[in-house]
Amino acid sequence: MTSFQVIIISFFCLILVGTLLLMLPISSRQRCVTSFPDAMFTAVSATCVTGLVVKDTATYWSLFGQAVILMLIQIGGMGVITVGLAIIRASGRKIGLWQRSTMQESISAPQVGGIVKLTGFILKTSLIIEMIGAALLAPVFCNDLGIAKGLWYSLFHSISAFCNAGFDLFGIKEPFSSLTFYHSNIYLNIIIILLIITGGIGFLVWDDIGTHKHKIRRFSLQSKVVLMTSAVLIVLPALYFFFFEYDHGTIHDRTIHSLFQSVTTRTAGFNTTDLAAMDESGTAIMIILMLIGGSPGSTAGGMKTATFAVLFLSAITVLSRRNDVQCFKRRISDEAVRSAGAVLFMYLVSFFTSGIIISRVENLPLLTCLFETSSAIGTVGLSLGITSGLSAVSRVILMILMFFGRVGGLTLIYAALPSAESQNSRLPLEKISVG
């Protein structure tokens, strides 16, 4: 098997195990067997760190069921291959070149060298950040829910936020309410925002930061592009939300709501305000942000910030009539440009076609369905409230999109198709008019 096929199969196996565990009577509060479709949808959503749900996580699932969901989020967020290699390393067995190559593809690392060390860094950093996040959230939740329940909620939401999953346990207040009851708690909002950004920015960027500290000039081109693009994609949407969506209330409330919505829309799926109250332009902007998603080698899904940046730079190159796509005094390879174009095409076709099909099947407005499909393929988890009422056909479509968005479109294609043979000759070149 190729590395791409191993990645696909490993995610399939994790989803299957999660589905079977969630079907057990002990996983539901009613101690009844959960249907296979509902259990599988939840397992796919958790493994693919999305957050779309058909059963409210707090009121339907028992403590055991919630623990299974959290396990799927943790392994799915860090990567099945990452966790697998860590287990192999802990057992004292040697990690061969094939396993290293698979890990490289799994996290989009630039080279095989140092991949084992990077695996340890990913696991250690993830667990440390999640524990810090849980400790910071504990005062809020323990004060509201008591010590035992508060600690569990702190751990659950810290991992869910860092892994950009968007699963929450606040259905105890109102089903599918997410973090709306904490919309005015600036402290909690900031902690969740920082956890989301930390998980969505990518482990490769954090490795660069850990290695070179504040010496940004020594960062890799990818890290520079990711940091710059992420900053732009946080600030600009936040400004739009501030001036056009949250144009009432105090400055402090408008600022934190705008910033939270900008950050969570691209990757996480938490919400502190009513999304259905947004106008169509705001909904359209959120769809674009969800399609872009997080960064390469992160816990998030979507097209990725680096892909968006390469596409933008390619357009600038064409408009300025230059030959090479450039950024930070470096040339970007033609292969990266072609791959970015292919990813954009696959995501647009998949999300738009799926939205049309769901709209026809469910007899729902197209924009509402496009919001749902972009949320699924971007592994975000935001919804306008239609997920639980969808038919089996629409749910299957969403599951496919979630899986597509988590493992990556190119990974799926490369896993399905045989490797292309190298060609020693090239066909004659002929121009074709575009634009």
PLM features per residue range, with description:
Residues M1-G435:
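Membrane-proximal intracellular helices of multi-pass ion channels
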